[in-house]
Amino acid sequence: MISIITPAFNEAANLRSLHTRIVDAMTKLGVTWEWIVIDDHSRDETFAVLQQLSAGDPRVRGVRLARNSGSHVAIACGMHLAAGDAVIMMAGDLQDPPETIGAMLDRWSRGAQVVWAVRRSRPGDRSHASLAAIYYWIVRRVVGLRDMPATGADFFLADRRVVDAFRAFPERTTSVFNQLTWIGFRQEYVEYDKQPRAAGASGWTLARKIRLVIDSVTAFSNAPLRWCAYIGAGMLVVALALAVAGVALLPELGGGILLVLAVLFGVSGVQMLALATVGEYVWSALAEARRRPQYVIEVSTAETGDLAGTVNTVK
């Protein structure tokens, strides 16, 4: 069986069309499948649509989270619930065409354990594409996950062994895609053309993008801490040079107080930046140490085994 999981936030206008296309694609492939949609506490009729789809198609399962937790938490929830031999994650906005699933399953049948659908083209404004390019450069060069596709990938297939390994991860403040890249196994790629959003607006705000960058770096890399050490060492060298210059030259020059203030503000700024960097790591460690549940399920469309109130557990 193939499990398809979809995080959804205010996607009521897209889910019926996506369901139709998934049914068509999977019927042509002739495989058994289930579709698990995780409603990330939407403000529209997303869960009502899921109830209707589930009533007409028992392969559809809707789960509503008790609070808005972000797409990566919703994806993790879906991977915890999926029962398939392979799990496919695709967006709910029709930007990831279900017709690509056939190529992904072909790679899986030939031994690939993670299959990334890599974008050949990306619709949307250039600013969004530029931010995405910067993020994936950071992931590859700073975080050190060089197997991450340069153009990024958020449409993937994971084998059951990979999913089981992912479930053992205790981290809460990180990226599912980064975890799957780090986890290893045999990873391959297929290309596709990302489609324009069919309806609605993306909930992927600039603030969430920045948060994802910070979480990705603090979860996988100590590079910022080393940068702080290098900058601090460099500033000590500069301070020593300024002290020597001050003793030798400033009695003959005016404006010495301005130089002192400039150095003071510069040093203070670097200290605050270093403190903030360390603080991010401390906060990330504290968030993990609390061991709060990553998500809580408010209600499910499942006819048996109601999941209401279910939380994920970490062994």
Predicted feature residues:
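Structured catalytic core of nucleotide-sugar glycosyltransferases
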Residues: M1-D125, V314
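Short conserved micro-motifs on helix faces and helix-strand junctions that flank
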Residues: P7, L65-R67, F156, A229, ...
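A general structural signal marking secondary-structure boundaries and capping sites
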Residues: M26, A112, V142, R146, ...
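Structured helix-beta-strand junction loops
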Residues: G56, G84-D85, R110-G111, F169, ...
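Acceptor/aglycone-binding surface of glycosyltransferases and processive sugar-polymer synthases
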Residues: V63-L81, Q95-T174, Q179, Q195-I214
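Hydrophobic helical membrane-anchoring modules
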Residues: S175-K315
